[in-house]
Amino acid sequence: MKAKSKQPERSFPFLRINEREGKPRKRGLTEIRGPYYSVVGRRYLEDLFETMGAYVDSLKFAGGSFTLMPEKAVREIVDLCHKHDVLVSTGGFIERVLVQGGDAVRQYITECKKLGFDIIEISAGFISIPTDDWLRLIELVRKSGLKAKPEVGIQFGAGGATSAAELEAEGTRDPNWAIAQAKRFLDAGAEIIMIESEGITENVDRWRTEVPARLIDEIGTEKLMFEAADPDVFAWYIKNYGADVNLFIDHSQIIQLECLRAGIWGTKSLWGRVVTYKESRE
């Protein structure tokens, strides 16, 4: 097992905050979105990791953005992430690869391994795939030496730049289905489950807060990561499930989220109220 990295000494050490465990952590994970809505390259990430790297557990390429980038640039990002103990995820691009057949999927996984990716997210927001086939993909990813991270949600057509009206027309699944899927994926060896925000807190008239509540009640928080790339959404998760809930956010939001986790700043409903209790390891 990899030894936990020591948290760097922060400024103003005499001020008490909710201290974070060293990496690798099992709770309070933060995954940041990398290249997609904006250019995120090595030089930008050097600044981000120099200041906030201790709080980032993984970086996710979105929308298959790595397929547009020079291989050298992808490798530089991956290597820089690893230097700062940050894992690298493919994002859910495999569903785009799946429509090209099994050979393309195997080549994709091999290439991800070669480039140094750690996590392959397995999404099916736009396609319909049998659960048993999904389980085979998890097994294939694991046998390649990578971590499988299936994405589960209740919204048909989720995962892209789809309008709220289009998503509403597509309809939603029963949350019981999502819970059953997540349990089967974990039993098959999935590292953690990504919970898609669309249909729950994104592109909806009313937040479906009962869905994450049921998922957490059935599975717990440690094996779930919630998409929350909106300040109101990640503040809601922190308020309701505490500082150690696992969240996916945009790279631009890392400081704002960590201020909430640390209990040093926040909105009126959270200011000074986020508290943790950790046994001393000294």
Predicted segments with their positions:
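Active-site rim beta-loop-alpha module in soluble metabolic enzymes
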Residues: 186-208
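C-terminal alpha-helical cap/extension of soluble enzyme domains
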Residues: 5-22, 214-282
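Conserved N-terminal beta1-alpha1 strand-loop-helix module at the mouth
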Residues: 2-62, 66-76
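Generic structural signal for hydrophobic
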Residues: 48-52, 81, 111-112, 141, ...
